[in-house]
């Protein structure tokens, strides 16, 4: 499971990062990461994996977002609706703390029967967001032709 999960999350050999709020059922995964040199105490990381069940847990992970290298991998791992684990968040709700700092969900992966992971990325690095911003700027700066109101 360990190497398959890393592959799903695009974590490659040589990358280092943080694993936060690890539940007991993932202690073996945590040990695997530590023994294979994936976990670092440095403030410069390639990835952050954060287990969350509510917005407070998400907020506790935010300081580590700022440790990510340019376009580092940010994964929030949360209980699936089908699991018996209690959670105040789902793939569609509860991510406001990350939205407030300019991050948006871009991918989802199944971790196991009970957990799923959402990948977040800075909106400044998402191509569709850049296109929308360019279009908005173009429309906002457009001055209608005052001589002919039918021409935009």
Task: Tell where the protein language model's regions lie, with residue ranges.
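Short acidic low-complexity segments
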Residues: 35-45
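Short, glycine-rich nucleotide/cofactor-binding loops
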Residues: 48-59
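Accessory recognition modules or surfaces
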Residues: 60-67, 74-75, 109-135
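Catalytic cores of nucleic-acid ligases and guanylyltransferases
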Residues: 15, 20, 41-42, 51
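Long, charge-dense
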Residues: 85-87, 92-121
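N-terminal, charge-rich interaction modules
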Residues: 1-31
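Mid-chain, well-packed structural core segment of small domains
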Residues: 60-93, 97
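Flexible, glycine-/basic-rich loop-and-beta segments that form/coincide
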Residues: 124-152
